[in-house]
Amino acid sequence: MDFPENLPSDIGRLEQIVSHFFPKALHIVLNSRIPSLQSRGRTRERLSGLNVRKSDKWFNLVMGDRPAALEKLHSWHRNILDSMIIDIILVHPISNDNLDDDDDHSDSVVRSAETVIERWVVQYENPLIMSPQSSDSATRYQKVYKKSIILLRSLYAQTRLLPAYRVSRQLSSSLASSGYDLIYKVSSFSDIFSGPVTETMKEFRFAPVEVPPGRLCASVTYRSDLSDFNLGAHITLPPRIITDYVGSPATDPMRFFPSPGRSVEGHSFTGRAGRPPLTGSSAERPHSWTSGFHRPPAQFATPNQSFSPAQSHQLSPGLHDFHWSRTDAFGDNHQLSPPFSPSGSPSTPRYISGGNSPRINVRPGTAPVTIPSSATLNRYVSSNFSEPGRNPLPPFSPKSTRRSPSSQDSLPGIALYRSSRSGESPSGLMNQYPTQKLSKDSKYDSGRFSGVLSSSDSPRFAFSRSPSRLSSQDDLDDPDCSCPFDFDDVDESGLQYSHSLDRRKTSSSISQSLPLGRRSSQDAAVGVLVHMLKTAPPLRQDSSTYMASMSGVQREGSVSGTESEFSMARSTSDALEELRNYKQLKDLLLSKSKSGSGPTRVH
């Protein structure tokens, strides 16, 4: 705020701040307490800063044009040393029990009483002893002005926290005359509260602002409890609870909620690039927050109304159009609709065209859902992973495939993912066409497409992780790591990929699918070597050690089923057969040695 430069001294500027502080504080209190004054100054022009007087811009708090009553009150205050006392008075009716028996008033006449529920005091305290002036008098008024802004903002906030503010709001929104009203009285002096009234009042003092040679003070004395006046029983307020809201158990399920103008239909997303959006006959159902929730269910979608692969690629999973009662170029009216739904009930299905897509028969009132098969989803996989907006599916997640029953089945998926990232298809051809079907077994898709369909049978796209680095949550899924080094893979495209080895049978498969000389770092190669040395069987073992090791393997459960027991029985019988042959050979050698070492003849 720029102050006038024609003031004679710094004292004149300080007096100007105080003189503007009093009417601003009065305007704040009356605007929050008197219902007849609350409607004034609430126009759009006040919010936009248009048609605002220069005096209203003081203290960076625009309250709007002052009413005529405030203009009259502004003229009475000429001396800043006089206190300004604002009494907020509640006018309330009194019962006939309080009337005297000899009163001439009839029962039809209602008497009212006035009770002071708040008293605001704003004053400038000028000490009798003048304090010495500091040397920085040139910037003193700027500090006082900034502190005055803080004091007025505190005053503005405190007016909204006291009980009288709630009464003022109730009276301003009352539907009928209740006999209650709030009035005010402004004066330089007031009567002192009596003893019983003082016990029901509380006082709050604001931090004063030092304005040399005195200080600017503000305080409020208020009634903390207004339940004695029984305001709730006499004030008729508009209902705040909607009893016939959409989805209420008390509402008829087939009730039609009309909307003004044309019919409104809810969509999760609309068409783009000249494609018309789905009409009312398509496979969709209005959401619960639209006006047509209880309409009869529409017919299911036909194959010619489903999205094509090209349309699926052009629609990004995370981008949806939000419309608020807006009519598009095709004449359809749409409302605001979030892209994701918390449950499967209000979600609009998303279709991928294909003749072999299985459908689920649903009862009326449930959104139709199409679950795409793995072969259909593989057909529309795009190799351009650098553009996530064109890829309708999340990127490959090698770690998520480890949740499958076999840990080795996920390794070809990792190799396929890396080959697709480098632009090579498994068959040696360039994977440039999105309609090319990847030659990959369907069991590899169990981890990759785990986030596409939710448990509520509502197709949606989950937020995919970064393909270059797995999240820390996946690292916690595998606490057992037998390799002491991090397995960091750096492919030709410069992407880093971290992967931890399994305890059993994983190092050999990784060494086959990922050559160490090309993709593995030196630390990873040492880790694989240490793992191989730890898990390598001994070079020589006897039959007892072999039997003990086979029994230990059987206890661990690595061999299961009839086939494994049959192979173990064959190995035991073969060992016994070899032992029997060794015994026969030993007996034969001993018999020959005895026959050869008989008594020799002496010639």
Curated annotation (Swiss-Prot):
Which ranges are annotated Basic and acidic residues under compositional bias? Answer: 320-331
Q: What happens when the gene is disrupted?
A: No visible phenotype under normal growth conditions. The double mutant plants atg13a-1 and atg13b-2, or atg13a-2 and atg13b-2 are hypersensitive to nitrogen or carbon starvation and show early senescence.
Might you report a single GO cellular component term?
cytoplasmic vesicle
Descriptive protein name: Autophagy-related protein 13a
State the oligomer form and interacting partners.
Answer: Interacts with ATG1A. Interacts with ATG11 and ATG101.
Residue ranges annotated as compositionally biased, kind Low complexity, are 453-473
- Signal peptide residues are none
PTMs per UniProt: Phosphorylated during nutrient starvation. Dephosphorylated in nutrient-rich conditions.
Biased amino acid composition, Polar residues: 301-315, 371-386, 419-437
Source organism, top-level taxon: Eukaryota
Gene Ontology BP term (one): autophagosome assembly
User: Which keywords, in A-to-Z order, does the entry hold?
Assistant: Autophagy, Cytoplasmic vesicle, Phosphoprotein, Protein transport, Transport
Residues with the Phosphoserine modification:
248
This molecule's function is given as: Involved in autophagy in a nutritional condition dependent manner. The ATG1-ATG13 protein kinase complex regulates downstream events required for autophagosome enclosure and/or vacuolar delivery. Becomes a target of autophagy under nutrient starvation. Connects autophagy to plant nutritional status.
> Where does the UniProt annotation locate this protein?
Cytoplasmic vesicle, Autophagosome
Q: Which family is this protein grouped under?
A: Belongs to the ATG13 family. Plant subfamily.
Region spans: Disordered:
258-477, 498-518
